[in-house]
């Protein structure tokens, strides 16, 4: 955990005891489109970060909420970030849970299942326009380097896990098994 990730976490129990976190982070209630629009209309919100399937409680906001949220993000120039740490990599019958809602986020965070649970590994995917703003020049290309990045074992585990997901059609299997559970 980082103070940045804690600052955008909606669970106050996780934040207790960590002191000052990033200022200006506001949580809005799930499925409350009016609360979201109120915050975004201030035009000082960099990003709307959401879990399609919330890790705590396995709750999913409505399809209408997500469609309206995406439109509001476009309207107010706010980035839409899908936190797929727990629900991504085929766990819901699609590569990413946001696909069930027809969403097209600007940024996607992935971890946990990315290595099949073998080693810690995470990734971030983003639009080319975001990449160009962050890493547009040679002096910016290593602006966010890290000590443990590009770990060979983690990357190998990630590639192997993705190969198994594809070769054994586990995403499709998760979808069909999920439909059986609904019946």
Kindly label every feature range from the protein language model.
Residues 1-183:
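Conserved N-terminal phosphate-binding loop of PLP-dependent enzymes in the Aspartate aminotransferase
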């Amino acid at each position: 955990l980082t103070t940045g990730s804690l600052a955008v976490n909606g669970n106050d129990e996780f934040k207790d005891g960590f002191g000052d976190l990033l200022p200006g982070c506001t949580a809005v209630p799930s499925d409350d489109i009016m609360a979201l629009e109120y915050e975004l209309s201030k035009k000082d919100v960099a990003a709307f970060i959401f879990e399609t399937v919330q890790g705590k409680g396995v709750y999913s906001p409505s399809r209408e909420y997500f469609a309206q949220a995406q439109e509001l993000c476009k309207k107010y120039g706010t980035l839409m970030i899908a936190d797929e740490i727990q629900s991504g990599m085929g766990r819901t019958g699609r590569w990413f849970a946001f696909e069930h809602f027809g969403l097209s986020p600007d940024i996607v965070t992935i971890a946990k299942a990315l290595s099949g649970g073998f080693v810690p590994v995470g990734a971030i995917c983003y639009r080319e326009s975001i990449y160009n703003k962050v890493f547009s020049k040679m002096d910016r290309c290593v602006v966010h380097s890290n000590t443990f990045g590009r770990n060979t074992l983690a990357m190998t585990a990630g590639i192997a896990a993705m190969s198994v997901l594809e070769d054994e059609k586990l995403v499709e299997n998760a979808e069909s098994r999920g439909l059986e559970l609904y019946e």
